[in-house]
Amino acid sequence: MNSKNDLNDKFISFLDQTKNEEHKEVTRLNDRVLIIDGLNTFIRGFAVNPAMNDDGLHIGGLIGFLRSVRYTCDILKPSRCIIVFDGKGGSPKRRKIYPEYKANRKVKSKLNRNVDWGTAPQDEQESMKQQMGRLIDYLEQLPLTLISIDNVEADDVMAYISQQVLTESDIFLMSTDKDFLQLVDDRVKVWSPTKKKLYTKDAIQ
């Protein structure tokens, strides 16, 4: 699995490409961009998906994530998919990349598990760590962009990309975090994977 520095370098490369490349192929690639809140999607799958492997180990986070992304891509048919994960140290060291978005944010509530797998908290944390590691390995084999920046949370990066980088693209933000609704405009829409609903500018007015 690549290190955080590798993912940071990939993000810098991504910014350089989207800002400097003007080829028609790149333009088409950025026509309809799906940007996914990675940890939000993983935690949701981990909490509610009871899938087990042949050894009886819980793999709901991994399976739930992949199924959710596949379903969303089938529905929205993006030309490009970007998955953003919280960077190491993101929570205690919040960086205000897009101040207008951060100004009116509410504190996020902790996700409650809907199913008890009968595991101790430390075992649950280890399971999450192992599933996340395997998930990243799988995602790196797919034609999508993975982004994680140390000391920066995923929602900051998603807001920055949608408002400051891909300014000519139709953007679909995938998350259950209602704070993203602040970003909805003529270009930016929010897809709720739990409600299977697309929030447009007209829908939230």
Spell out what each predicted region is:
Residues 2-20, 24-174, 180-198:
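Noncatalytic, basic helical substrate-engagement surface that gates or grips nucleic-acid strands
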Residues 197-205:
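A short, charged helix-loop
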